[in-house]
């Protein structure tokens, strides 16, 4: 009996990414990187505080790592970014330490909090106060992981590169050609395959 899948698969704990759109740390270390054979060994690795996600040490073996997260293992000097491959699965994508200093986030919503402070919420549940007033929903912002500040942003615009993060075309990369507004239902964004 295969005890690693189906009902026995590790359920990701609650965290910044949705249950359906994340990868528990234990799978990443055990099945993807082959650093451990059993769940116990993953626990031992995590408890020695080697693993960092987005620059913070995570010891929870079922911590949900999701799209665009940076996983760094100081002991081996490796950095990974979680990215979908064309089939819509998470790929192990190694990156340089320079690239591991930032991540890209999609802006989910923008609202004005108490005393008129503008807030911005990203796809991995980060809340940032006082964002640039030019940033709108669906834009992409580049976040410096050490400070959590916005360093740069890309408008949601025609002619930009994009990556599909959900649905049947998950993981496909293309150029935004045009966007149809459908008031009351979903907008349709036409993407030309790269």
Curated annotation (Swiss-Prot):
Q: Which residues form the S4 RNA-binding domain?
A: 23-85
State if Amino-acid biosynthesis is listed as a keyword. no
Output the Gene Ontology terms for molecular function.
RNA binding; rRNA binding; structural constituent of ribosome
Keywords, ordered alphabetically: Ribonucleoprotein, Ribosomal protein, RNA-binding, rRNA-binding
Q: Which InterPro entries match?
A: KOW, Rib_uL2_dom2, Ribosomal_eS4, Ribosomal_eS4_central_region, Ribosomal_eS4_central_sf, Ribosomal_eS4_KOW, Ribosomal_eS4_N, S4_RNA-bd
Keyword Ribonucleoprotein on entry: yes
Q: Tell me which Pfam families the record gives.
A: KOW (PF00467), Ribosomal_S4e (PF00900), RS4NT (PF08071)
Give the domain of life: Eukaryota
Q: Which GO terms describe its biological process?
A: translation
Gene Ontology terms: cellular component:
cytosolic small ribosomal subunit
Q: What's this protein's family per the entry?
A: Belongs to the eukaryotic ribosomal protein eS4 family.
- Name of the featured protein: Small ribosomal subunit protein eS4
Query: What organism is recorded for this protein?
Result: Equus caballus
